[in-house]
């Protein structure tokens, strides 16, 4: 079949290259992975006696995800099995945790918190049982109403999947370059 094969001038290796969304996750080494994929394509073409194609890929999430941080203002805090910190956002600005269980982390962003921590869940403002922004995270035990939580690595899908669910506004974007 190789003698009658169409010679592909270019092969797109696609996208979806992984990034670390939470502490303890490893980011993919994109140089190693893309080299491995390109070597596999080129060795297969050599074995079939075909010329090497131009190889492209789509690094969107790998570039954009770490570039976004979503800020939430803490509203109420309930101390139950684990502490629930209710924020002023939620599934309307990041549906991924509710839709398919995506996990994130959060950090106190507006001040230095106490050294003592509590296991917390960051919940959204919508009256939905699945409106959870962060399933479990260690936050300062002195977290209080008005504090700002930063949820990193939201650049890839947060804004593009956001909606006006329950007539909420889509959060503003602040673009920062270097310093």
Question: Which role does the model predict for each range below?
Answer:
Residues 50-179:
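Charged (often Lys/Glu-rich) extended helix/loop segments that serve as interaction or gating elements
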Residues 1-78, 166:
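Active-site loop/helix belt of alpha/beta enzymes
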